[in-house]
Curated annotation (Swiss-Prot):
Family: Belongs to the LpqB lipoprotein family.
Organism taxonomic ancestry: Bacteria, Bacillati, Actinomycetota, Actinomycetes, Mycobacteriales
Keyword Membrane appears in the UniProt entry: yes
Topology with respect to the bilayer: Lipid-anchor
Lipid attachment points (S-diacylglycerol cysteine): 29
Any Pfam family the entry gives: Germane
Chain spans, region Disordered: 39-59
Gene: lpqB
Name of the molecule in the record: Lipoprotein LpqB
InterPro entries (alphabetical): GerMN (IPR019606), Lipoprotein_LpqB (IPR023959), Lipoprotein_LpqB_C (IPR018910)
Main location: membrane
UniProt keyword annotations, A-Z: Cell membrane, Lipoprotein, Membrane, Palmitate, Signal
Protein location: Cell membrane
């Protein structure tokens, strides 16, 4: 899938008829926009389209003036110059707009006191997020309350007292900022990893913003799990231009882009490929088209590409690629593994097709290996579940047992299987490629188990850098961090899908920066959530019968199992035709969809 088609896919998010609290926005759409947070508020000095509130309207009543002020506050240009026009001259000079940036919705402006020339209002709202330096969005949940005072000056109301920091109405924030992903490298240097940011400003300033943020590096929580070839003193020399050197409309329409880097250390061909992949996928994801002419101190960055790079030159690291297209859909049907085609289902050869006692299973990314959780059939207090591992068309061996084992999930290189055992222990099963021998090691999941009692779902992202989990019915994302000595830990878990409204039952990765969640609800049983928690989209519910008990996904298609069948949703269908369709051979039976991962 191309960045353009992915963007189009996301623009078709569906508004639920009976919306979740978090899905309801002033504009009526069931989500925040696509991506993480904006650039550090109060630090952006550039030309921008500007707020639609150019200056305070004459004769405005104080409560309406406050609402105009919140609207103007979403324009960060020149330290929120548009918003400062609503302040008295003295307060305008003192206001610390960079102290914080709080995103709220359902803003109430409540009168507290009012005289002929003084007025005080209480501002109450729902807090939904915080903007942090570097454009990082942190999802939050709670109430927000503050007081703002105004006074009459020259016949016009102006704000005379307000808290430090910026208050951003979510609907206005979404009109001003866009979510764009920076791309860093996984530890093995085999793919790029998204780090969503929110940026504002004109499209012709987007390339400069994104490359600057890329050079600054990943957010702190992600830093231990990724690499950045643009670190170590790399900077941009001169302005970023179109490929032919023109300085107007850079990054807009055709004409490509040229970036002259300086401070680039000596690199071999592979390192240059990784460097270019970070730059190209960051720009391509932001709808900045190539060719991408990359220079180092005025000379071609790589002599193989003197006229510029294209996305085809770094296609092996495409963050939108998926292995499921080549491996195909499988399913767990009545306890057995079957392959699924347009004409029906076929039991797979070997143990996994013959067994009748499997509860969940996972295919490796290349489709050659299988891990499954099987029912032991033994009475309590004996372990009820066994984790079976084997080749696709061969036998299987039990590698561990437990009272409960989550659906397994494979590491991207197919070398390890992850699962949660008994709700509170996360393990990795290592498999030697040559011999097939397995060993079980624990993962440090203390940061996750501190959040709740029971882990019921664990899914690794396709780049292997993040883990999506369900803990006590809530959705969390953690960073997969390799510690000194080779051990792994799940670090910095953060709640996403805040305000989900009903317990999460199942989840899976759709793209590298979105997950699909099935929840215990009949009105909107399936939603799509951004990794930074900034966005939640209601997926269509037509044809589904609650509860939806399982979900599996690729970049192009979601599959779910409800109480009577397995359904698929094609992300490329037109919005009016986008609904769940039954998968042949998986209707009227107990079945769960299975894609690689």
């Amino acid at each position: 899938m191309t960045p353009g088609s992915r963007s189009a896919m996301r623009s078709r998010s569906v508004c639920g008829a009976i919306a979740l609290a978090v899905l309801v926005t002033v504009s009526g759409c069931a989500s925040l926009p696509d991506s993480s947070t904006p650039q550090a508020i109060g630090t952006i000095n550039r030309d921008s389209p500007g707020s639609s509130v150019a200056a305070p309207a004459p004769g405005r009543e104080p409560d309406l003036l406050l609402r105009d002020f919140f609207k103007a506050s979403t324009d960060p240009t020149d330290r929120h110059l548009a918003a400062r026009q609503f302040l008295t001259p003295g307060v305008s000079g003192r206001w610390d707009d960079a102290a914080s940036a709080t995103i709220v919705d359902k803003v109430d402006v409540l009168p507290e006191t009012r005289s002929a020339d003084q007025a005080t209002y209480t501002i109450r709202a729902n807090k939904v997020g915080q903007l942090e330096p570097g454009g990082l969005y942190v999802a939050e949940e709670g109430s927000f309350e503050t007081r703002i005072s105004l006074e009459l000056q020259g016949g016009e109301w102006r704000i005379s007292e307000l808290p430090a920091g910026v208050i951003l109405d979510r609907a206005q924030f979404l009109n001003t900022y866009q979510r764009k992903s920076l791309y860093f490298l996984d530890p093995a240097g085999t793919t790029v990893v998204p780090d969503p940011r929110w940026v504002s400003g004109a499209q012709d300033q987007m390339a400069s913003q994104l490359i600057g943020l890329l050079i600054d590096g990943p957010k702190a929580a992600l830093a231990p799990a990724v690499r950045n070839e643009l670190g170590d003193g790399v900077s941009v020399r001169g302005p970023i231009t179109k490929a032919d050197g023109r300085t107007a409309q850079v990054g807009v329409g055709l004409g490509g882009i040229r970036i002259d880097f300086t401070g680039v250390p000596p690199m071999d061909a592979q390192q240059k490929q990784l460097f270019a992949a970070q730059v190209i996928w960051t720009l391509a994801n932001a709808e900045i088209s190539g060719p991408y002419v990359l220079l180092a101190d005025g000379e071609p960055f790589d002599e193989r590409f003197p006229n510029g790079w294209t996305t085809a030159d770094v296609a092996s690291m495409n963050p939108f690629a998926t292995s499921s297209a080549t491996v195909g859909l499988h399913a767990l049907r009545e306890g057995s593994m079957v392959s699924v085609t347009e004409t029906g289902v076929t039991p797979v050869p070997g143990y996994f097709g013959a067994a009748r006692n499997m509860r969940s299973l996972a295919l490796s990314q290349d489709g050659k290996l299988v891990a499954a959780v099987a029912d032991t059939g033994r009475p309590a207090p004996e372990p009820a579940s066994s984790l079976m591992v084997g080749a696709y068309e061969d036998g299987a061996a039990s590698v561990l047992e437990g009272g409960a084992i989550t659906r397994p999930t494979w590491a991207p290189d197919n070398s390890a299987i992850w699962a949660a055992v008994n709700g509170n222990t996360v393990i990795r099963v290592l498999r030697e490629p040559g011999t097939g021998r397995t060993s079980v090691v624990n993962v440090d999941a203390g940061a996750v188990t501190a959040l709740g009692a029971t882990i019921t779902e664990l899914r690794l992202s396709r780049d292997g850098v993040r883990a999506a989990l369900i803990v006590d019915g809530k959705v969390y994302l953690a960073i997969v961090t390799q510690m000194p000595g080779g051990a792994y830990a799940l670090t910095n878990p953060r709640a996403v899908a805040i305000g989900l409204g009903s317990p999460a039952l199942s989840l899976d990765w759709s793209t590298s920066d979105t997950i699909v969640v099935a929840r215990a609800a009949s009105d909107i049983p399936v939603v799509q959530v951004a990794v930074d928690g900034s966005r939640m989209d209601a997926l269509p519910s037509r044809n589904l019968t609650a509860p939806v008990v399982a979900v599996d996904a690729s970049t192009t298609t979601e599959f779910v199992a409800d109480s009577r069948a397995v359904f698929q949703l094609n992300n490329n269908d037109p919005a009016g035709d986008r609904y769940w369709r039954e998968v042949p051979g998986l209707t009227g039976v107990k079945a769960i969809p299975v894609l690689p991962g």
